[in-house]
Amino acid sequence: MLYKRNLQLNKNGELIHLLSTEGLPKSILTQVLDTATNFVSIGDREVKKVPLLRGKSVFNLFFENSTRTRTTFEIAAKRLSADVINLDIAKSSAVKGETLLDTIANLSAMAADLFVVRHSESGAPYLIAQHVAPHVHVINAGDGRHAHPTQGLLDMYTIRHYKKDFSNLTVAIVGDVLHSRVARSDIHALTTLGCPEVRVVGPKTIVPGDMAPMGVRVCHTLEEGIKGADVIIMLRLQNERMSGALLPSSQEFFKSFGLTPEKLQLARPDAIVMHPGPINRGVEIDSAVADGTHSVILPQVTFGIAVRMAAMSIVAGNEA
């Protein structure tokens, strides 16, 4: 991890910031998943609100664009009855040269209780968490290629929902692992929750061989990677983070690593297919798979709201 290993926990071992799945004990991960279970049904109610964060102010600070993640955080906060402030960072003081910490100090002076931060620089949410007041909490909504803990947790929730238990699963993470903060968050969570086999799958240029110390099996062919898998997590190619020609072409990638109905037959008959989005159809996944019976991509989005509600309610309920 970057910075202090226990920055996310107070002296009693309670979650006060959610910055990474790395370093969090199994009990905390399970607490978030169990709490999310209580929130899933709220979306089906006529009044989709609970008063847990009434009177609290949640600031969404997205220095990097993400419609899906920002929207689900906003929905989650509003369902907890929080006041939500979305900052248009592109037009804000950050463009005018104000430092990140000066921005946070000014927003804290406006009585912020919780910052949801997405930033292109790895470690930015950690820096913020080190400098906020004891009653203020930080949730990392994605920092560089480092971590995306709520996506990792919603992936764990989805897996647990469909597979009940992690102890006998084989999970394959396929695609641009090198640039994926989701892959790192998933790997740390899966190993902590007791998944016995996690595979990372893709060409050598975007699936480094030195990932084995993370407790994963590295596979450089799709056939090896998904054979007998219970769960397949597809990742998009992050061309915006690639410097140089790491891949021949999208078409070549699809030919070798794109998940098609034919290739999916190598996995277990009851395998589920996941994707953090946005999907690039015809690049990492065939439409017939994305829209097929094995796909749980849309339920992931639904569960994401409940998981983000759980994360916000837990951190806001604990003092530093």
Swiss-Prot record:
Pathway in which this enzyme or protein is active: Pyrimidine metabolism; UMP biosynthesis via de novo pathway; (S)-dihydroorotate from bicarbonate: step 2/3
Keyword Magnesium among record annotations: no
Top-tier EC class: transferase
Purpose of the protein: Catalyzes the condensation of carbamoyl phosphate and aspartate to form carbamoyl aspartate and inorganic phosphate, the committed step in the de novo pyrimidine nucleotide biosynthesis pathway.
Catalytic activity: carbamoyl phosphate + L-aspartate = N-carbamoyl-L-aspartate + phosphate + H(+)
Binding-site positions, L-aspartate: 96, 181, 236
Gene Ontology CC terms, in alphabetical order: cytosol
Record-listed E.C. numbers: 2.1.3.2
Assembly information from the UniProt record: Heterododecamer (2C3:3R2) of six catalytic PyrB chains organized as two trimers (C3), and six regulatory PyrI chains organized as three dimers (R2).
Keywords: Pyrimidine biosynthesis, Transferase
GO MF entry, a single one: aspartate carbamoyltransferase activity
Listed name of the protein: Aspartate carbamoyltransferase catalytic subunit
Binding site for carbamoyl phosphate: 68-69, 118, 148, 151, 277-278
Organism superkingdom: Bacteria
Homology family: Belongs to the aspartate/ornithine carbamoyltransferase superfamily. ATCase family.
GO BP field: 'de novo' pyrimidine nucleobase biosynthetic process; 'de novo' UMP biosynthetic process; amino acid metabolic process
SUPFAM superfamilies the UniProt entry points to: Aspartate/ornithine carbamoyltransferase
Organism the protein comes from: Albidiferax ferrireducens (strain ATCC BAA-621 / DSM 15236 / T118)
Keyword tRNA processing attached: no
Gene3D superfamilies the record matches: Aspartate/ornithine carbamoyltransferase (3.40.50.1370)
